[in-house]
């Protein structure tokens, strides 16, 4: 599931919702993560394979943009890069997809939910690259390191 929202008690593919006014769109780009948090479903392979957010393959930038083209993003409140892995593992995708989103709707709030290791993962300072593309960065403090 590439684009999803929280609906009821679980994750719902955006494409399968008939009404989504005011919902948040989550963008699931990767399963990769440098952390091994004991509470995370990723650490239990059996659970990871059956979880609806586990990606069989990483979506290309073009595939993600195609999913956005199939919906009216003006119906949503916010777009968040978050999923089963660490979004900054796909920095190139975040940048290109955010450029697309801001081109379509410059007022759409965008956010990354991250472990905060983006600079280490990418071996460079990433904040300047995200300027004017990402409005909010939420850093999880749950990792054991």
Language-model features: where?
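Canonical Radical SAM [4Fe-4S] cluster-binding loop centered on the CxxxCxxC motif
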Residues: 13-63
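Canonical radical SAM enzyme core domain
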Residues: 50-66, 87-132, 141-145
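Short coil-to-beta-strand
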Residues: 36-38, 132-139
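Short Fe-S-cluster ligation motifs
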Residues: 61-82
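Flexible loop residues that form catalytic
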Residues: 45, 84, 142
């Amino acid at each position: 599931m590439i684009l999803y929202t929280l609906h009821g008690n679980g994750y719902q593919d955006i494409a399968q919702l008939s009404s989504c006014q005011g919902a948040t769109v989550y963008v699931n780009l990767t399963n990769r993560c440098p952390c091994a948090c004991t509470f995370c479903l990723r650490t239990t392979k059996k659970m990871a394979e059956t979880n609806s957010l586990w990606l069989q393959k990483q979506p290309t930038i073009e595939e993600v943009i195609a999913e956005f083209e199939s919906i009216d993003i003006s119906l949503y409140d916010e777009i968040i890069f978050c999923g089963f892995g660490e979004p900054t593992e796909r920095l190139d995708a975040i940048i290109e997809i955010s450029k697309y989103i801001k081109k379509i709707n410059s007022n759409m709030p965008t956010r990354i939910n991250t472990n905060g290791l983006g600079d280490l993962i990418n071996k460079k300072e990433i904040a300047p690259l995200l300027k004017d593309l990402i409005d909010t960065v939420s850093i999880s403090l749950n990792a054991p390191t």
